[in-house]
């Protein structure tokens, strides 16, 4: 495949680079590109213009081994099956909207139904299925800017939405994702990234023994459609108490009703504090990789890959239940139905601007 590369030397002879490669074509002939970002300090990420997917994310572990810590597929054809949202950008509205309906400014809106009776992750054709325009940013750190225009009425959402998402690898070994959007009408926006993490490596088996801490004292329980009931409950004395670090698998097979219903975790946590703060930290004891999550979003979904689509994944692997965990920073799911939840409303001409950062520490 044809590829293009550029690089920058920094102090201390750190060599950062961005390499562009043709990854494939969609069914209508639109080209999809891969951009490999390398910070020259042991962290690299491969980003696709299809869905803004993080295809690979390599972290150098304590033994010097490059470990790919995200699940994924090898080919565009596999990603086009739209299975599991692996590594993709999610929008306009991440997570669920009950019956695909909400009211805004006295008007009732119906958006795409794609999970039973409900809307999930933007509807039938969300941002995960778009081919994004890409621009390499002239910055001191390898950075890729992706953009799309979501038309007024697309998937039923009001307003023409101009969206920009920027991926940056910092010198301090963090993957930073900045989300920006502006609408010409009042609308709702709730964007995230749906990467599936396994800090031992994408093909290493379950994440049961990996350690997780979540900066949250409250979670939102779900009904049998995985839709929040509207309650906000204390994690104290439940399997949802990750305030102190514990193995992800410690309670994943618990008979606690909310765990049994979904075969693991698929729940929203209210992140303590305001502004840009630490939301979570995960660690693999075997290779010394720790991932810290920082965000200015109010909440985060923990999903423990309780059900993954069948088929062959990267490197010919077949992934199993609990092969990875997702930490999806977000507004609360179905927030428009509950006035006590933080509001995902974006007013006309105002800017939606949030950042989530995945910091990698090895020791």
PLM regions: where:
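An exposed, glycine/acidic-rich loop-and-rim segment of catalytic or binding clefts
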Residues: 12, 16-363
């Amino acid at each position: 495949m044809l590829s293009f590369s550029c690089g920058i030397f920094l102090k201390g002879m750190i060599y950062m680079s961005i390499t562009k490669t043709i990854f494939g074509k969609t069914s209508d002939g639109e080209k999809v590109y891969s951009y490999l970002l390398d910070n020259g300090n042991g962290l690299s990420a491969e980003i696709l213009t299809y869905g803004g997917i993080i295809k690979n994310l390599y972290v150098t572990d304590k033994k010097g081994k490059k470990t790919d810590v995200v699940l994924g597929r090898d080919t565009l054809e596999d990603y086009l099956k739209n299975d599991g949202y692996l590594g993709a950008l999610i929008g306009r509205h991440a997570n669920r909207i009950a019956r695909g309906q909400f009211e805004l400014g006295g008007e009732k809106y119906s958006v795409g139904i794609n999970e039973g009776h409900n809307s999930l992750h933007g509807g039938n054709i969300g941002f995960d299925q778009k081919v994004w325009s890409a621009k390499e940013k002239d910055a001191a750190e390898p950075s890729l800017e992706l953009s799309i225009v979501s038309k007024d009425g697309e998937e039923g959402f009001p307003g023409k939405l101009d969206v920009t998402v920027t991926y940056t690898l910092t010198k301090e070994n963090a993957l930073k994702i900045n989300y920006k959007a502006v609408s010409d009408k009042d609308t709702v926006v709730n964007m995230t990234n749906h990467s599936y993490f396994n800090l031992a490596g994408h093909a290493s088996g379950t994440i049961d023994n990996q350690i997780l801490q979540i900066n949250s004292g409250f979670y939102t329980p779900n009904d049998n459609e995985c839709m929040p009931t509207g309650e906000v409950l204390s994690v104290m004395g439940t399997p949802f108490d990750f305030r102190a670090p514990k193995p992800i698998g410690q309670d994943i097979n618990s008979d606690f009703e909310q765990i049994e219903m979904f075969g693991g975790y698929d729940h929203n946590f209210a992140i303590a504090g305001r502004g840009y703060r630490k939301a979570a930290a995960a660690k693999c004891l075997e290779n010394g990789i720790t991932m810290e999550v920082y965000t200015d979003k109010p909440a985060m979904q923990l999903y423990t890959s309780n059900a993954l689509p069948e088929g062959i994944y990267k490197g010919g692997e077949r992934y199993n239940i609990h092969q990875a965990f997702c930490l999806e920073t977000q507004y609360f799911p179905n927030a428009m139905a509950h006035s006590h939840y933080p509001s995902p409303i974006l007013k006309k001409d105002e800017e939606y601007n949030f950042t989530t950062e995945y910091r990698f520490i090895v020791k």
